[in-house]
């Protein structure tokens, strides 16, 4: 086991396929558990791109709402700052969220040797007939996290989450 990094910075980007379209969120205020809701379409595929610093860290998959997404190492960014992984998240078979409701979905990403990144996204899944609703709100490119691994190498504490 190597040294435990003081801080881990990671970003998670979602792009709807087949044309790398943006994903949107809306600000719900205090009506639900979180003030931001990510809008996703059922029966769709999303490219997941995970970027990690320090570049020595390794992951094999990310679980999004119980769906295991294998991640493939793509290499380092041109500036060498972060390592890049990609995978495909498929919402086929996911039930649309009822009107006026939101779904908390668990996100987990186990890192080799330093513990598991965990967070919860508040999501609304729209069925294909309401796909225009998925494009109301604010587009985001990436969700960035600043995390601190704990000493037992089991979990990482999330210090900061930013939608950019």
Swiss-Prot record:
Q: Which GO terms describe its molecular function?
A: type 1 cannabinoid receptor binding
Q: How does it assemble?
A: Interacts with the cannabinoid receptor CNR1 (via C-terminus). Does not interact with cannabinoid receptor CNR2.
Functionally, this protein is described as follows:
Suppresses cannabinoid receptor CNR1-mediated tonic inhibition of voltage-gated calcium channels.
Which InterPro entries does UniProt cross-reference here? Answer: CNRIP1
Give the UniProt family note. Answer: Belongs to the CNRIP family.
* Native species: Mus musculus
Tissue expression, as annotated, is: Highly expressed in brain. Also detected in heart, lung, intestine, kidney, testis, spleen, liver and muscle (at protein level).
User: What name does this protein carry?
Assistant: CB1 cannabinoid receptor-interacting protein 1
Its Gene Ontology cellular component terms are: cytoplasm; GABA-ergic synapse; glutamatergic synapse; myelin sheath; plasma membrane; presynapse
**What's any GO biological process attached to this entry?**
regulation of trans-synaptic signaling by endocannabinoid, modulating synaptic transmission
């Amino acid at each position: 086991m190597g040294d435990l990094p003081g801080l881990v910075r990671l970003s998670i980007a979602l792009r709807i396929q087949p044309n790398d379209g943006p994903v949107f969120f809306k600000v719900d205020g205090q009506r639900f558990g979180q003030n931001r809701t990510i809008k996703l379409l059922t029966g769709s595929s999303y490219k997941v791109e995970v970027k990690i610093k320090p570049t020595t860290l390794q992951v094999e998959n990310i679980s999004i709402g119980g769906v295991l997404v294998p991640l493939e190492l793509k290499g380092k960014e041109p500036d060498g700052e972060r390592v890049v992984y990609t995978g495909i998240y498929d919402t086929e078979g996911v039930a649309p969220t009822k009107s006026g409701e939101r779904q908390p979905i668990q996100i987990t990403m186990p890192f080799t040797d330093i513990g598991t990144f965990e967070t919860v996204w508040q999501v609304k899944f729209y069925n294909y007939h309401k796909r225009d609703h998925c494009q109301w709100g604010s587009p985001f490119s990436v969700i960035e996290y600043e995390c601190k691994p704990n000493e037992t190498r089991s979990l990482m504490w999330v210090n900061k989450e930013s939608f950019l």
